[in-house]
Design a protein with these regions (language model features):
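Single conserved hydrophobic/aromatic residue that forms the stacking wall/gate
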Residues: 1-13
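Structural motif
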Residues: 19-62, 91-133, 162-206, 237-281, ...
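Short acidic, glycine/serine/threonine-rich loops at helix termini
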Residues: 66-70, 94, 102, 115-116, ...
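Flexible, glycine/charged-enriched surface loops at secondary-structure junctions
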Residues: 78-89, 123-130, 149-161, 195-196, ...
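Conserved loop->alpha-helix
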Residues: 134-151
Length: 300
């Protein structure tokens, strides 16, 4: 739509040829319910386009904190990028400027360590490089896990996670602004026997896989029957089925499926994770870090 010439199959990116040329179109419209990765990609190239770019988002906007994170980091590197109203983003032609920058650790990745603490009888974990006043929308993980008995102690450029044992009897939450945390909480709540209703999950269908369908399928292997409603809600009201004797979790080429299900070994005799290498997308040291924390991991 902004002028890039694509030749080849629409279904397979490996069969496409992209022809570069000057991109002059300065306005584009796209649905606000697409993955924020598409919006962030357009924002980041916008300053170097001939006429800049105005992005109009239609309908409901999901994952707004991820968009705001992109805007904040662009501003940190000298580019003015901003909302002009609730559904419109504008970036003028301008140049990025290099600047010293401390890269914060990933709160999304931290969620799996919160999960480990929540599923443990006693645990304390220190995670370096995380800030209380974080740009990242997924830093809300600390507040949500407080409901599941995990306390967060903020230090200088680090957090300490401790089990306090005080969990809610039920958890209802709208993940519209933190969809990448949903898998972690689905698995954690079920294993803690905490019924839940999680809404705002419509973007899970357009991630690395249809995460809603994947969660329903894989949680059934562990003996939990989840229900999807309106394409945006996952719920569990305590309904159980027979647990597979040797559950093997399929990861669907999705890094978050592997990392959300691995900690289930704390509540089950064992768990098998198929295609564990998928974690390389966002957390390549995940398995090594688990080993250092005392988990026994074997390749089969």
């Amino acid at each position: 739509e902004i002028g890039v010439r694509l030749v080849g199959s629409e279904m397979c990116i490996r069969d496409r040829r992209i022809t570069g040329r000057e991109l002059r179109k300065d306005t584009i419209s796209l649905p606000g319910n697409v993955s924020s990765q598409y919006i962030s990609a357009l924002l980041m190239i916008a300053p170097v386009l001939t006429n800049g770019l105005t992005i109009r988002l239609t309908g409901d906007i999901i994952s707004r904190p991820y968009i705001n994170l992109t805007l904040q980091l662009m501003n940190d590197f000298g580019v003015r990028a901003e909302w002009t109203d609730d559904h419109r983003l504008k970036v003028e032609p301008q140049a990025y400027h290099s600047t010293p920058f401390y890269v914060e650790s990933d709160w999304s990745a931290a969620s799996y360590w919160y999960q480990i603490v929540a599923l443990s009888k006693e645990a304390e974990v220190t995670l370096p490089g995380l800030f209380k006043d974080s740009y990242q929308g997924d830093s809300q993980v600390a507040g949500i896990f407080r409901s599941l008995g995990v306390e967060t102690i903020y230090k200088d450029k680090a957090v300490i996670l401790k089990k306090n044992g005080k969990s809610v009897e039920r958890l209802d939450y709208d993940f519209i602004n933190q969809p990448d945390l949903a898998q972690t909480f689905v698995v954690t709540c079920a294993l803690l026997n905490i019924p839940f209703r999680f809404s705002g999950l419509q973007s899970l269908k357009i991630k690395e896989t249809d995460r809603m369908a994947a969660l329903i399928t894989e949680m059934r292997k562990l003996g939990y029957i989840l229900h999807e409603t309106d394409g945006s809600v996952l719920s569990w009201e305590g309904e159980r089925c027979t647990t597979e004797e040797h559950p093997a979790i399929d990861t669907y080429e999705d890094h978050r499926m592997a990392m959300a299900f691995a900690p289930t070994c704390l509540a089950l005799p064992e768990i098998l994770i198929n295609n564990p290498q998928v974690v390389s997308k966002s957390y390549p040291r995940y398995w090594e870090d688990l080993r250092q924390a005392g988990f026994i991991i074997k390749e089969v």
